A protein has these predicted regions:
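A conserved acidic beta->alpha catalytic loop
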Residues: 25, 32, 41-49, 64, ...
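Conserved donor NDP-sugar-binding/catalytic core segment of glycosyltransferases
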Residues: 96-143
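Active-site-adjacent helix/loop segment of glycosyltransferases
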Residues: 219-334
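Conserved donor nucleotide-binding strand/loop of the catalytic core
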Residues: 49-78
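Short, flexible, basic/aromatic active-site loop/helix in glycosyltransferases
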Residues: 134-173
Length: 347
């Protein structure tokens, strides 16, 4: 039997409702007959494994929930192909997804991993429209690795907040997005895979950082390799994810001692200004604090006027809430996770 060209791993935890859609999308891939599809059921209690088996794909079941990083490790270690590709159960790959993604790895021995674009589903709620306009699932650009210093990261934050212009076209990046990424299996073996202490949030960034800084090779972004992500339409879920990403940022900082912390300054400034206004009884300070998001994220009100979309005037505050929840997650992990990432300890 001919070995598959790639193994597609879908990790699930109680994903029975969403899983059929992604499996159907994988069944319509232009390269379908060259693929192995593997579902890793990470301790679900809703019949996820039975749903996967009904679609005729390989299934591996964790008896207990071990986290996304552990599920991904199970997936690539069980792959029968030289390349392993990851997507999620709430994603819908385009029919030519892998036809466009795989050549980035296969045609260049210096490329050890590749990722494609992850876009939000058609906007039918305020939250989804915001996430479509302010996509949280973008690759980390290569300029992030130019320096680990705090000043460099602060400059990147201000620059991207004021004028968030994203590069276009295929290019090298410092990290790809977990919902749309592919690696050589041999490369993952050398790196010992994902660090399972990350559980969820930051695990792919940690892996990519280790790979790139080790000199193993380059990571390539292929924007035409498209996956649609069905974001949960509620603001509550968006903020929950932001908090989880903040915990991942803290794990990155605890593990990589040379890395500056990823903390968003604007929520801290707004809270400090509001506290000072209340303490000193300066109501004008409170007004100024509430206008800070409109000034720093000035592209939102500008676009609201130019494009006649008044709803976008709310977006600076949604972004403020996201960044604030990320900071809360960061602080919580810094308080509780130090023992887990003791100095010199490896995964």
């Amino acid at each position: 039997m001919t070995a598959p060209r790639a193994t597609v791993v879908v990790c699930c935890f109680n994903g029975a409702g969403e899983l059929p859609k992604v499996l159907e999308a994988l069944a319509t891939q232009t390269l379908h007959d060259q693929l192995e599809v593997l579902v890793v059921d990470d301790g679900s209690s809703d019949g996820t494994a039975d749903v996967a088996r009904a679609h005729g794909v390989r299934v591996i079941v964790h008896e207990r929930n071990a986290g996304l990083a552990a599920a991904r490790n199970t997936g690539w270690r069980s792959a029968n192909a030289p390349v392993v590709v990851f997507t999620d159960d709430d994603c819908r790959p385009a029919p030519d997804w892998l036809e466009r993604l795989l050549p980035a790895i296969e045609s260049d021995p210096g490329v050890i991993g590749a990722g494609g674009a992850v876009l939000g589903v058609d906007a039918d709620s305020l939250t989804r429209r915001y996430l479509q306009a302010n996509n949280p699932l973008l690759p980390l650009e290569s300029d992030l690795l130019e320096s680990d210093g705090l000043a460099h990261r602060l400059w990147l934050y201000v620059r991207r907040s004021v004028a968030p212009q994203q590069p276009t076209g295929a290019r090298d990046v410092s990290s790809v997005v977990g919902a749309n990424m592919a690696f050589r299996v041999e490369t993952l073996k050398l790196a010992e895979g994902f660090d399972e202490r990350f559980h969820f949030g930051g695990e792919e960034e940690d892996l990519c950082r280790r790979l790139v800084l080790s000199g193993a090779g380059r990571l390539r972004f292929v924007p035409e390799a498209l996956v649609i992500h069905e974001f949960e339409p509620s603001l509550r879920d968006t903020l929950r994810r932001s908090k989880a990403y903040g915990r991942g940022n803290a794990r990155m900082y605890l593990k990589h001692s040379d890395l500056s912390p990823t903390v968003y300054p604007l929520p801290l400034l707004v809270v400090a200004a509001l506290a000072a206004a209340a303490f000193l009884r300066r109501p004008r300070w409170a007004v100024a604090a509430l206008l800070m998001p409109q000034l720093l994220f000035a592209h939102w009100p500008a676009k609201a006027v130019v494009r006649r979309r008044p709803e976008w005037l709310v977006y600076p505050y949604l972004q403020l809430l996201q960044e604030g929840c990320s900071d809360v997650g960061f602080a919580g992990m810094m308080l509780t996770g130090r023992d887990q990432f003791a100095a010199g300890e490896e995964a």
